[in-house]
C-alpha cells in the first residue's frame, strides 16, 4: 500500500511577484523541487520516477506545513487536511527546468489574511522583500509512494530505499522547518 512521504526544500526569494488573478491579489512565489536522482530522508527519487509524476503537482494545494490528524500525515485534499493547512495557496505552472522541477506557489492574499498562519507567511514574505534577516521559507513535496529495496548501485548513493511514486499530493510551505533537500542541490523558493 502506498504511503505518503514528505520531501522538503528551500524557497528562492529573488523572484517573488504580485499578480491579479480572478480579480484577486496573489503573491507568486517561484520554487524548485525534486532534483533528479536526489536522496532525501533516506529515499532515492530517480529521474525516471520524477519525470513520470512531477506534472501531478499542477493545481495541487500548497498548505502551510504538512497536514496531520492525530500525528499522522493526511492528504492536503482531505477535509481534515484542508482545515488544518489551507491558507489560500496552491501550485501552478509546474515544469521541468534542467534537472529539477520548477513550480510557483500562488497565494491568495485575502484568503491568507484570514488565518494566523497565512498572515505569518505574508509577513515573512514582506520581510524577505525588505531584505530583513529572517529565516528562509522552505517547501516540501508530499507524494504517495512505495519504498522499494535499492540495488547495490542505488545503495551506494546513500539510499535506504527507492521511491516508486504513485501520485503527488501537495507541495507544502514551511515556515518553521528545514528542507530535506538544500539550495546547494538546487531546491527551494
Residue ranges of each PLM-predicted region?
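Signature of dsDNA virion morphogenesis modules
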Residues: 1-189
Amino acid at each position: 500500500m502506498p504511503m505518503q512521504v514528505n520531501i522538503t526544500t528551500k524557497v528562492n526569494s529573488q523572484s517573488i511577484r504580485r499578480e491579479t488573478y480572478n480579480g484577486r491579489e496573489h503573491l507568486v512565489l517561484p520554487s524548485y523541487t525534486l532534483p533528479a536522482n536526489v536522496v532525501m530522508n533516506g529515499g532515492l527519487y530517480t529521474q525516471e520516477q520524477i519525470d513520470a509524476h512531477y506534472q501531478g503537482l499542477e493545481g495541487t494545494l500548497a498548505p502551510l506545513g504538512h497536514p496531520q490528524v492525530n500525528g499522522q500525515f493526511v492528504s492536503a485534499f482531505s477535509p481534515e487536511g484542508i482545515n488544518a493547512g489551507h491558507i489560500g495557496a496552491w501550485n501552478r505552472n509546474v515544469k521541468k527546468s534542467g534537472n529539477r522541477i520548477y513550480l510557483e506557489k500562488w497565494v491568495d492574499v485575502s484568503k491568507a489574511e484570514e488565518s494566523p498562519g497565512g498572515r505569518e507567511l505574508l509577513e515573512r514574505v514582506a520581510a524577505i522583500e525588505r531584505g530583513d534577516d529572517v529565516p528562509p521559507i522552505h517547501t516540501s513535496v508530499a507524494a504517495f509512494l512505495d519504498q522499494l529495496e535499492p540495488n547495490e548501485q542505488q545503495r551506494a548513493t546513500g539510499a535506504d530505499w527507492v521511491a516508486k511514486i504513485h501520485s503527488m499530493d501537495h507541495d507544502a510551505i514551511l515556515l518553521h522547518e528545514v528542507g530535506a533537500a538544500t539550495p546547494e542541490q538546487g531546491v527551494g523558493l
